[in-house]
């Protein structure tokens, strides 16, 4: 591939990470949280930990939570769900909007339920804003406003998403610099915060500081070397396409789910572009791989600032 392969490693010169089997059971009240980039093996590690410690998995994935969005979300298979119960997978209707705050509320309820039955919750997911919301809470910025979101969507539809992103850049360049123009939901949210409060999203985040933990959490991730992770991404995309991903998206669009938040996620967005004639068939898989790798780079940026214990997993 033309771009440099990806790496998920604690340090290029570090010793090999320990086996996942060395992970100690959680202390009382401690929350095990499996993080890591797409295709690194989070689901398998979470299931093994649940099997080992008598636990259940709580998904922290902003696409897996929706029903109908199956192949391209990497949902656990029926066989995997038979090994460990999963929460917040196939939990809500595709057109229901779930943000980080609502996820944290749902996850807290699931964690309380699991612990109430004497079992161990294992959080697993690559939507790191959701993980942060659960572990650290969110900044006290103004709550979401559906009217503002609808207004911003109308601007994006009429003038293009780049135009909405430019509006954000004019008032909050720091947020605009970290958000892709196509990320309509997050661009709209950042712009909405400024419009409603007169302060940038970055200023709200700086004020919060995210220093007081709501949970004593231990972050775990699977170590993958560059070539291995790159291969896993390509194989995953190819496999999903062979299993009928295009047909799944075609069905979703035909049933009125074109405005579902998950339809704008990596992979689903590219398949939709293909079905709408904007992306040739022979360019579909490479486009999804490129978008996935871009997303993984953003995930890795977040991981670099966290205290993550890396383990080896076959």
UniProtKB/Swiss-Prot annotation:
Binding site for substrate: 38-43
InterPro entries tied to this protein: Dimethylallyltransferase, IPT, P-loop_NTPase
Region (Interaction with substrate tRNA): 61-64
SS bond partners: none
EC number: 2.5.1.75
Lineage top rank: taxon: Bacteria
Catalytic activity: adenosine(37) in tRNA + dimethylallyl diphosphate = N(6)-dimethylallyladenosine(37) in tRNA + diphosphate
Keyword Membrane: no
Cofactor: Mg(2+)
Gene Ontology terms describing biological process: tRNA modification
Binding site residues for ATP: 36-43
Entry-linked Pfam families: IPPT (PF01715)
Site (Interaction with substrate tRNA): 127, 149
One MF term in the entry's GO annotations: tRNA dimethylallyltransferase activity
Keyword terms: ATP-binding, Magnesium, Nucleotide-binding, Transferase, tRNA processing
Function: Catalyzes the transfer of a dimethylallyl group onto the adenine at position 37 in tRNAs that read codons beginning with uridine, leading to the formation of N6-(dimethylallyl)adenosine (i(6)A).
Subunit (UniProt): Monomer.
Family the entry assigns: Belongs to the IPP transferase family.
Protein name per the record: tRNA dimethylallyltransferase
Source species: Sorangium cellulosum (strain So ce56)
Phylogenetic lineage: Bacteria, Pseudomonadati, Myxococcota, Polyangia, Polyangiales
């Amino acid at each position: 591939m033309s771009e440099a392969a990806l790496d998920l490693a604690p340090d290029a010169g570090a010793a090999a990470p320990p086996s996942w089997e060395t992970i100690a059971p959680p202390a009382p009240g401690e929350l095990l949280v499996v993080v890591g980039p797409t295709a690194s093996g989070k689901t398998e590690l979470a299931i093994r930990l649940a099997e080992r410690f008598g636990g259940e998995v709580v998904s922290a994935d902003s696409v897996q939570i929706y029903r109908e969005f199956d192949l391209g979300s990497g949902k656990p298979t029926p066989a995997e769900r038979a090994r460990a119960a999963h929460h917040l997978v196939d939990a809500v209707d595709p057109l229901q909007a779930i943000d980080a705050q609502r996820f944290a509320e749902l996850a807290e309820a699931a964690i309380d339920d699991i612990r109430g039955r004497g079992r161990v919750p294992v959080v697993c997911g690559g939507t790191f804003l959701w993980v942060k919301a659960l572990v650290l809470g969110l900044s006290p910025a103004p709550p979401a406003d559906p009217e503002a979101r609808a207004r911003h969507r109308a601007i994006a539809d009429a003038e293009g998403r780049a135009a909405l992103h430019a509006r954000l850049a004019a008032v909050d360049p720091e947020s605009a610099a970290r958000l892709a123009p196509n990320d309509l939901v997050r661009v709209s949210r950042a712009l909405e915060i400024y419009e409603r409060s007169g302060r940038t999203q970055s200023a709200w985040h700086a004020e919060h500081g995210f220093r007081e933990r709501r949970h004593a959490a231990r972050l775990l991730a699977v170590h993958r070397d560059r070539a291995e992770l790159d291969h896993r991404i390509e194989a995953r995309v190819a496999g999903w396409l062979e299993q009928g991903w295009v047909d799944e998206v075609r069905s979703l669009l035909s049933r009125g789910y074109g405005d579902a938040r998950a339809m704008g996620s990596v992979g689903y967005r590219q398949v939709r572009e293909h079905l709408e004639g904007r992306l040739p068939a022979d360019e579909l898989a490479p486009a999804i791989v490129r978008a996935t790798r871009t997303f993984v780079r953003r995930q890795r940026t977040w991981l670099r600032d966290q205290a993550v214990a890396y383990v080896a997993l076959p």
